[in-house]
C-alpha cells in the first residue's frame, strides 16, 4: 500500500 505518514514541510 502507498501511504504518507511523514512530517511534510509546509
UniProtKB/Swiss-Prot annotation:
Keywords, A to Z, come to:
Amidation, Secreted
- Tissue specificity field: Expressed by the skin glands.
* Residue positions, PTM Valine amide: 10
GO terms under cellular component: extracellular region
Its annotated compartments are: Secreted
- The protein here is known as Novel peptide 3
Question: What organism is listed for this UniProt entry?
Answer: Pithecopus azureus
Amino acid at each position: 500500500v502507498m501511504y504518507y505518514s511523514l512530517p511534510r514541510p509546509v
